[in-house]
Swiss-Prot record:
GO terms for biological process: G protein-coupled receptor signaling pathway; pigment cell development; sensory perception of smell. The lineage of its organism: Eukaryota, Metazoa, Chordata, Craniata, Vertebrata. This is Chaperone Ric-8B. Gene3D superfamilies: Leucine-rich Repeat Variant. It is found in: Cytoplasm, Cell cortex. Keywords: Chaperone, Cytoplasm, Guanine-nucleotide releasing factor. InterPro entries: ARM-like, ARM-type_fold, Chaperone_Ric-8_A/B, Gua_nucleotide_exch_fac_Ric8. Belongs to the synembryn family. Chaperone that specifically binds and folds nascent G(s) G-alpha proteins (GNAS and GNAL) prior to G protein heterotrimer formation, promoting their association with the plasma membrane. Also acts as a guanine nucleotide exchange factor (GEF) for G(s) proteins by stimulating exchange of bound GDP for free GTP. Acts as an important component for odorant signal transduction by mediating GNAL (G(olf)-alpha) folding, thereby promoting-dependent cAMP accumulation in olfactory sensory neurons.
Amino acid sequence: MSLSDILSEIDGGDDKKVEKLLLKYNTENSRTFAFDLEEEGARIKLCQGLLTVLRRSDLPLCQSTCLETLRILSRDKHVLGPVATKEGMLTLAGLARICVAGHEGEPLEEAQSAEEERVVVEALKCLCNVVFNSVPAQQMGGDLQLAEGLCPRLHLVSASHHEVGLFSLRLLFLLSALRTDVRSTLQKEAGAVKLLTNVLERTLDVRWVGPYEAAPPDPEAPPIPPENNELTMEALKALFNLTMSDSCDKDSLHKLRLIAGIMRHLLMLKTHSEEKTEETHSHAINLLSNLPVQCLDVLIDVPVQGGLEKYRGKNMDTVQILLDFMIKRIDKGFNFKEGLTPVLSLLTESARYHREIRRYIKAQILPPLKDVKERPEIGDTIRNKLVRLMTHVDMAVKQGAAEFLFVLCKESVDNLLKYTGYGNAAGLLMARGLLAGGRGETQYSSDEDSDTEEYKSVKPFINPITGHVEDPLPNPLDEMTEEQKEYEAQRLVSMIDELSRKELIRPMGVRKDGTLAPLGQAIHDCSLASSGSDSD
């Protein structure tokens, strides 16, 4: 399809012929995402021409066809100049029935026919593409208060107008993700957090039985319908952006506790496929990670449903779901940074500040040790898998796994080493300045960990570096004469000296405060401390 033919018909003013040519173009390019550079100028002119047709035509079929073409063209960020202007954005906002600053648009309620609704949907899709691909369009969207104009529509989001709701939520997500000023306005002035929370309540059919406790789902209830699940995920993504600030006033905490209650309800639900369930739960976990830690007690405090007596009546169903999710992500064996670190972080902070959660998780992951014949990183238990991650190449992953286990050990270095071995924990201890032992800064309850009799009996024989009982090895020095020992010692000193002079290695020592320092400096500091303590 020649772009020049389409441009000629647009200039001629025959919208029927334009529509016919555009239908053919759309069919040919529906899956086109890479465009010919030589036709870039023609595509820019076509964008401008399409806006002209959209302003002069009032035929829904012609409008939706033009918008579909514009949506295809908007995949190319280099041709969006005409669309990213005030006039271009106003045209699209008007067709999407969004009221923007200083321009009263036609309300959405008046879009009765399927053809008119198709125009609204295509306009929203265009806006999503244009905002995503064009910084000037993002700026113009902020100036026109496009996101604020979307907020009244959130009252109408439902499965009956699925695509209108879906792309309205997606556009709100994009605007709030790409513009911090828009995010702030939505939080403080537009009441978007409450509106999005209401969307989730309606979409998930939440029925409250307590201040922050939703009625448990019926075991025989069908899974979340696919359309409702799509709306849920878009609302969760938008809420994630809007809960990134640290606002903790009384009203904000109430709203965030409601969100935590809805997330608990959502984690109990299933969708039509295991893959979609995991994706939805992943968005819920991301959102929970944004909430202040004092709101997370909502996950376990459900008086109507009740809980476990050994955990002071707290309900651990949600915590178990989070643990199962974490294990599933570990077992996948890839994409740990994006897929695993959010749930690790959530479980870590929950365990750090909620004693019952920590006790429950520790019972699952770090039960009392019995068999210490194998290294901590060898095996298929959750502990083995997490210890392996402590030496992962990705810094965020290794730190997340190490911090999680450290918190489960109440930030006690001795307890951590018991479960992981010094070698696996060295990175965390060095970063925390705890190589000499001690505890972290968080205050924990005084209940003590008890060792099993099996562990106590072999404790003196455990290699503290590897964390397990090693088979006795023959001492190579036993077969050497004194002259051979002296020769090997001198050779070792020479090799270390050569590597040090070439700065390939740097001998390190531990200061009294547990931090690392070059060996000479560490010895000097210790000498000064010793001489100071000996003086009167």
